[in-house]
C-alpha cells in the first residue's frame, strides 16, 4: 500500500514538473525590480508582472497570465502590435511561439536574458533581449528579427520594447520645446485610446520633442514618492513611443524606431537589430528614477564616468558675437579666479571677407577674424596656458 502511494505521488510530481517545464517562467530582475514572463498553454509568451521586486517566488503563482509580451499583427488582439511584417506571399500575419531562452551573467552586476520566439508556419525568428543592470535598477531591451523565406521580408514595424502595466490611473510626462526653449514639461492623465510621442525629423529628431518619457502610476508624479517608470531610446533618428489604454484600463507602451517611412527589406538569414530601449522602475518617485539613470550612465556609458568632471566657462552667453582679444582675455582672468578648468571660445571667431558677426551669416571658413583676433587663436591659447587653464574652441561640421 505504501509502495502504491509512493508511486502515485511520484507520478503526480513528475507530471507537475513536466507541465512546469512546458511553461517556463522567465525572471528578469534588478535589486529593486522584477519583470516576469511565462509561456502559456498555447505556447506563446506573456508578461505576468512588472513592478517592485517580488521577494518570494511563491507570490508568482497568484499573478494573472497577463498580456502577450510582444504582440503581433493579424492575431486576436485588437490593439497596437509591436511588430508588423509582410511575408513573400504578401500575408502580414505573424504568430510567435516560445522556443527557448538563455540567461548569461556578464559580470559587473549585468545579466542578459534572450528569449527566442518563432512562427510555426513561416520561418521567422524574433529574439527579445533584456539586459538587467542590477545595482543601477536599469533594464535595456532590444529585438533581433531574422527569417529564412526565399525572398526578402518587408519589416513595416519593429519595436525595441513592449511593456504592459495595470494600474488605476496613468500620468504621462513628456518634454517638448524648440531652440532656446527646450524641455518644457507637460503631465497629463491617459484615458482610453492612444497617446503618441514621436518625431519625423530624422537627424534633428530631438528638435521639438525629447526622446524620453516619465509615467506615474495611480497618482501624478512626485519627487520622492510613488511608482514611476522612466524610459528612453538609444537612437538619434526618428523615434516613437505609443501609450495605449485598452478596454480593461490596461496600458501598453511600445517604443522604438518610428515606422513612418521606415520600411526595411530584410534579406534571408540576415539579422535586423533594433535600437536599445532603456527603462527604470521606481517606488520612490521620479527623483529615484532620475538617480538610477545617473548611476547607470556614470558606471556603464560615459567614458571615465566616475572621474571628477572639468568645469568650463564658455564666452557665448557673456559676449555672443561681440568680442575681441582683450575682452576674451578678461573673461579668462575671471574664470581663473573662480577656479574654472577650461575656457572655451564659441561662435564668431572666423572669416574675414564675410566675418561671422550674427547668425544671419554663413559659418564661414577656418580663418580667424583679424578685426577680433589680430594675433590669432594662438595668442588666446598662450594666455590660457599662462593662467593654468585649458583652452577649447567651438567648431561645426558645416564650416568650409
Regions found by a protein language model. Give the residues of each.
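Bacterial Sec-dependent N-terminal signal peptides
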Residues: 1-23
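Short acidic, Pro/Gly- and aromatic-enriched capping/linker segments at domain boundaries
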Residues: 20-25, 247-267
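Polysaccharide-binding surfaces and accessory modules of carbohydrate-active proteins
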Residues: 22-36, 44-244, 260
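Short Pro-Gly-centered flexible turn/kink motifs
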Residues: 32, 91-98, 264-283
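An acidic- and aromatic-residue-enriched active-site/binding cleft used to recognize and process polar
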Residues: 40, 148, 158-160, 348-350, ...
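Glycine-rich, aromatic-flanked loop segments that form ligand/cofactor-binding clefts
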Residues: 70-99, 218-242, 281-302, 341-347, ...
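N-terminal amphipathic alpha-helix/helix-capping segment at the start of soluble metabolic enzymes
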Residues: 266-267, 296-309
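Aromatic-lined carbohydrate-binding/catalytic grooves of carbohydrate-active enzymes
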Residues: 304-400
